[in-house]
């Protein structure tokens, strides 16, 4: 078994400065994620943290965004953060966990993957 981690950090202002936020959200987030963002009053901190989480997963997979689509990974916020990954596309991933944090103008996310050898 292999363990990999990925991390990402982003200034909230980078998301605030996006010209067409709705278009960006539809490109990056699933319907369920958009519903969660709406429940948080479209908080820029929430959007930034969730975006960082997707980037952190792509780094842990060593694919970057491109081979991994934004829609291949979903953050579900029911009882804490649960991350779902498209296992058809990434069958070697046995388990995934992530954490998102915010502090002032920054959001950061970290992801840990367990993979088959």
Curated annotation (Swiss-Prot):
Family matches, as SUPFAM superfamilies: 4'-phosphopantetheinyl transferase
Pfam family, one: ACPS
Membrane-spanning segments: none
Chief location: cytoplasm
Subcellular location per the Swiss-Prot or TrEMBL entry: Cytoplasm
Domain of life: Bacteria
Known cofactor(s): Mg(2+)
Single GO cellular component term: cytoplasm
Keywords: Cytoplasm, Fatty acid biosynthesis, Fatty acid metabolism, Lipid biosynthesis, Lipid metabolism, Magnesium, Metal-binding, Transferase
Alphabetized GO MF terms: holo-[acyl-carrier-protein] synthase activity; magnesium ion binding
Residues involved in Mg(2+) binding: 8, 55
Gene Ontology terms describing biological process: fatty acid biosynthetic process
Residues making up the signal peptide according to the UniProt record: none
EC class: transferase
Catalytic activity: apo-[ACP] + CoA = holo-[ACP] + adenosine 3',5'-bisphosphate + H(+)
EC number annotated for this UniProt entry: 2.7.8.7
HAMAP family xref list: AcpS (MF_00101)
Family label: Belongs to the P-Pant transferase superfamily. AcpS family.
Function: Transfers the 4'-phosphopantetheine moiety from coenzyme A to a Ser of acyl-carrier-protein.
Protein name as catalogued: Holo-[acyl-carrier-protein] synthase
Species annotation: Finegoldia magna (strain ATCC 29328 / DSM 20472 / WAL 2508) (Peptostreptococcus magnus)
High-level lineage: Bacteria, Bacillati, Bacillota, Tissierellia, Tissierellales
């Amino acid at each position: 078994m292999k363990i990999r981690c990925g991390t990402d950090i982003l200034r909230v202002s980078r998301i605030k400065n996006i010209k067409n936020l709705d278009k960006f959200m539809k490109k990056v987030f699933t319907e369920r994620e958009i519903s969660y963002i709406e429940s948080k009053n479209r908080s820029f901190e929430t959007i930034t943290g969730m975006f960082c989480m997707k980037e952190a997963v792509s780094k842990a997979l060593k694919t970057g965004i491109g081979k991994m689509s934004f829609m291949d990974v979903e953050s579900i916020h029911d009882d804490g953060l649960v991350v779902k990954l498209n296992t058809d596309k990434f069958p070697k991933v046995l388990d995934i966990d992530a954490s998102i944090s915010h502090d002032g103008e920054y959001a950061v996310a970290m992801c840990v993957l367990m993979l088959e050898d």
